[in-house]
């Protein structure tokens, strides 16, 4: 059995890769289909995911990570017997909450959360060195890469 990790966005993928590289998950890249997590919302729209599924003969468990709570994973008929479990991990309210918590700004955010999204709050309040948060994958790498303990 292998795990297929499907991240809906590049920032989710970056976080998962940082956690994998630092052995902070209950599994390693050896347990992953194709040895990597994938940036994919649906199987049918990802050639890389389909290729990995076609190469692996045994059962696969899918872990989907992203902010879409309602989007159902459509499993193509060719993989219905191979994919035996699908689990959804939702990043709601937003991935930026990881930054807000890491900076000990959760109490500050609570005061304004009814009128301010986490992304807007992070852009106004979070920095990494001299760089202001900009919702880029590079920012997540710079912020969490050197100190992944902020994620656990």
Q: Where are the predicted features?
A:
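C-terminal accessory helical subdomains adjacent to catalytic cores in phosphodiester-
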Residues: 2, 13-34, 46-152
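Extended, compositionally biased accessory segments flanking or bridging domains
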Residues: 7-9
């Amino acid at each position: 059995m292998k795990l297929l990790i499907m991240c809906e966005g590049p920032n989710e993928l970056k976080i998962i890769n940082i956690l994998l590289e630092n052995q902070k998950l209950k599994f390693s890249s050896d347990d992953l289909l194709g040895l990597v997590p994938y940036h994919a919302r649906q199987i049918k729209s990802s050639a890389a995911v389909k290729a990995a599924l076609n190469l692996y003969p045994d059962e696969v468990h899918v872990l989907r990570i992203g902010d879409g709570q309602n989007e159902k994973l459509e499993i193509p008929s060719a993989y219905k017997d191979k994919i035996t479990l699908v689990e959804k991990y939702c990043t709601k309210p937003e991935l930026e909450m990881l930054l807000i918590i890491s900076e000990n700004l959760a109490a500050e955010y609570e005061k304004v959360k009814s009128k301010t999204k986490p992304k807007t709050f992070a852009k106004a309040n979070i920095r990494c060195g001299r760089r202001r948060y900009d919702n880029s994958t590079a920012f997540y790498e710079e912020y969490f890469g050197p100190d992944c303990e902020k994620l656990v």
